[in-house]
Amino acid sequence: MANHKSSIKRIRQTNARRLRNRYYAKTARNAMKVLRATEDKNEAQALFPKVCSMLDKLAKKNVIHKNKAGNLKSKLAKHVNALA
């Protein structure tokens, strides 16, 4: 266990940040799963900007790497465009 007040606070902050990041990352993963499962093109086109926005926010906050966000958005765009 940490001895200094500042390190105790830092551990507390890190844990809170980790939980927050996990929540937002999981929410985005679930949204991507829903988008990939959609077969209706109109519904997918409505969901796509929301999911892209989530990914951009995660990349901006360094929860995921910006290149990973770009790759995921690209794959999702391919999926949406492939729907009939």
Swiss-Prot record:
GO terms for cellular component: cytosol; small ribosomal subunit. GO terms for biological process: translation. NCBIfam families: S20. Keywords: Ribonucleoprotein, Ribosomal protein, RNA-binding, rRNA-binding. SUPFAM superfamilies: Ribosomal protein S20. InterPro entries: Ribosomal_bS20, Ribosomal_bS20_sf. It comes from the Bacteria. GO terms for molecular function: small ribosomal subunit rRNA binding; structural constituent of ribosome. This is Small ribosomal subunit protein bS20. Belongs to the bacterial ribosomal protein bS20 family. Pfam families: Ribosomal_S20p (PF01649). Binds directly to 16S ribosomal RNA.
